[in-house]
Curated annotation (Swiss-Prot):
Name the record gives this protein: Leaf cyclotide 2
Keyword Transcription regulation carried by entry: no
Cross-link (Cyclopeptide (Gly-Asn)): 1-30
Keywords: Cytolysis, Disulfide bond, Hemolysis, Knottin, Plant defense
Function as written in the Swiss-Prot or TrEMBL entry: Probably participates in a plant defense mechanism. Has hemolytic activity.
Tissue specificity statement from the Swiss-Prot or TrEMBL entry: Expressed in leaves.
GO biological process, one term: defense response
Domain notes: The presence of a 'disulfide through disulfide knot' structurally defines this protein as a knottin.
PROSITE patterns: CYCLOTIDE (PS51052), CYCLOTIDE_MOEBIUS (PS60009)
Matches recorded under InterPro entries: Cyclotide, Cyclotide_moebius_CS, Cyclotide_sf
Family to which the UniProt record says this protein belongs: Belongs to the cyclotide family. Moebius subfamily.
Length: 30
């Protein structure tokens, strides 16, 4: 979902707590 986390996740992993790689390759708060 949104808002974005300011992180990209080309590897499929988000390192920011509470963020998911959706939609790839952008990390968003779930």
């Amino acid at each position: 979902g949104l808002p974005v986390c300011g992180e990209t996740c080309f590897t499929g992993t988000c390192y920011t707590n509470g963020c998911t790689c959706d939609p790839w390759p952008v990390c968003t708060r779930n």
